[in-house]
Amino acid sequence: MHEQRSLTMNALTPAVSTGPLPASRKIHKSGVLHPQIRVPMREISVHPTAGEPPVIVYDPSGPYTDPTVETSIEKGLARLRHEWITARGDVEAYDGRHVRPEDNGFAVGERLTPEFPVRNRPLRARSGKAVTQLAYARAGIITPEMEFVAIRENLGREMLRGTLQRDGEAFGASIPDLVTPEFVRDEVAHGRAIIPANINHPESEPMIIGRNFLVKINANIGNSAVTSSMAEEVEKMVWAIRWGADTVMDLSTGRNIHNIRDWIVRNAPVPIGTVPLYQALEKVGGIAEDLTWEVYRDTLIEQAEQGVDYFTIHAGVRLHYIPLTVDRVTGIVSRGGSIMAKWCLHHHRESFLYEHFAEVCDICRAYDVSFSLGDGLRPGSIADANDAAQFAELETLGELTKIAWAKDCQVMIEGPGHVPMHKIKANMDKQLAVCGEAPFYTLGPLTTDIAPGYDHITSGIGAAMIGWFGTAMLCYVTPKEHLGLPDRNDVKIGVITYKIAAHAADLAKGHPAAKVRDDALSRARFEFRWEDQFNLSLDPETARSFHDQTLPKEAHKLAHFCSMCGPKFCSMRISHDIRAEAQKEGMAAMAAKYREGGDLYVPAEESGAPLMPEAHELS
């Protein structure tokens, strides 16, 4: 069970969900190259009668599900990577920029969210240094972050190597039986994977995004001009990672953007992404035409100092691509894309994001902020899928990827959007070819436009498919997509839906450890171990509540049936009866074989004895 509690006495401190998931405990595995690292995983125990070991699963929930760790939202999480970062000797602390009124949308008085109580001096690269995981990987250095993610990806499967199965179609991905730190280094060095890990976010537990690793999911949170608060957004972040979000994007667009982000980053054990353009727009009063490179640059530095791990940069929206969207059914649906398109048309020139991209790289290089190159011209309806505007921008994203790589910056590429099923694979194939196998990060895609209120399902279908084809991270869609700002329950539904999609993709790709949890749950289902079924599921609370709606008594959790079929029509119970009967017949047949030969085995068919003796003969 989880509880929601404020971790200090201050009434302004947000209450967050804590406590372990059912039958689960946090375990840690230590490093070999870097013995100081402790990699978290979740161990799910099963009933002793099963005679099976616990199941180990990936766990991005941080200390919030570990009852042995005391957390304080006002203090933030432990800075576990700080010593790793400073030990490399290539960073320096400095005072950083001062927070200005425009950083929080000019909010004052009661409308101003309190500053995060603890302020550490930000770090940046020393002059001439690149402090990115890509730079280290290219230099042949295996960082603690690289060993951390290698251990994390394996999920203890080195203990299961004899039982693992490679069953799937990987479409060119090269998933190893065992992930080594050197394999991680090589994937990062070649740009096929990224480890989003800003040097000013030492609280984060390293994770990796790449098609040769587990498929990851992102959850979006953030306030708007009309709804939500700091307390709600911090709880949404904690709630999202509790259910399996690997990264979280803060897409706040209202007031208090700076202070809300500080509270989120300081308490986030996962990478945090943003769209800096949103805050830059707030700084100029929401007027796109008034945006400047200077305002945007200041916003990048502000967020890099806070510890944002990856930026969505809509630098691929070029002036001559905008006319390609005129005949679309839904035009330009990306907020960032529409802002930059409006700016370009007003000023009759290329965007400042495109013109100053090399300078953006210099900033990201100094803090190890990864690029998430935005798809500002993504299709917003299936009618617009795979059109000239979408693929023209993708070509530019490929060009920008090479520029970023030349600056030692980590890069992933954002993708659509709304794409019918038969057009999905073309998106993956083109992205791999154009962007040099940089990780693909897609929103869905939604496979049909007819289901407002159910777009977590329409997009989950596309997400599972494109994840199978090679997408490295899937951005979740909630039931509120196109309708409103998601609340806490919407966040959970979106995360669970996308955990299903990501896991289905891992299974289809033939990930060597993907089936372990499935098989454990299937055995529990066949053996009517109801509690194990609940606990091994992605959402134990919902599974248990659905079962208990019709069979609420504890005795029902020992029953060999559920309310769907009842005791007489349960297929698995009937299968048990068939298996028992077959076993009985087999024993009777064996007895017949031995009867004629005594201790010396003589096949019954050779002795003339009947294979199935009558019942009175066995009495």
UniProtKB/Swiss-Prot annotation:
Signal peptide range in chain numbering: none
Coiled-coil residues: none
Family membership noted in the UniProt record: Belongs to the ThiC family.
Role noted for this protein: Catalyzes the synthesis of the hydroxymethylpyrimidine phosphate (HMP-P) moiety of thiamine from aminoimidazole ribotide (AIR) in a radical S-adenosyl-L-methionine (SAM)-dependent reaction.
Compositionally biased residues, Polar residues: 1-11
Pfam families, sorted: ThiC-associated, ThiC_Rad_SAM
Species assigned in the record: Mesorhizobium japonicum (strain LMG 29417 / CECT 9101 / MAFF 303099)
Cofactor comment text: Binds 1 [4Fe-4S] cluster per subunit. The cluster is coordinated with 3 cysteines and an exchangeable S-adenosyl-L-methionine.
Catalytic activity: 5-amino-1-(5-phospho-beta-D-ribosyl)imidazole + S-adenosyl-L-methionine = 4-amino-2-methyl-5-(phosphooxymethyl)pyrimidine + CO + 5'-deoxyadenosine + formate + L-methionine + 3 H(+)
TM annotation in the entry: none
Record's keyword annotation contains Zinc: yes
Pathways involved: Cofactor biosynthesis; thiamine diphosphate biosynthesis
Domain of life, per lineage: Bacteria
Keyword Translocase belongs to the record: no
Enzyme class: lyase
Quaternary assembly: Homodimer.
Protein name: Phosphomethylpyrimidine synthase
EC number: 4.1.99.17
A cellular component annotation (GO) from this entry: cytosol
InterPro entries listed in its UniProt record: ThiC (IPR037509), ThiC-associated_dom (IPR025747), ThiC/Bza_core_dom (IPR038521), ThiC/BzaA/B (IPR002817)
One GO BP: thiamine biosynthetic process
GO molecular function: 4 iron, 4 sulfur cluster binding; carbon-carbon lyase activity; zinc ion binding
List of residues binding [4Fe-4S] cluster: C562, C565, C570
Disulphide-bridged cysteine pairs: none
Residues that hold substrate according to the record: N220, M249, Y278, H314, S334, R335, G336, D375, G376, L377, R378, E414, Y441
Spans annotated as Disordered: 1-25
Entry keyword set: 4Fe-4S, Iron, Iron-sulfur, Lyase, Metal-binding, S-adenosyl-L-methionine, Thiamine biosynthesis, Zinc
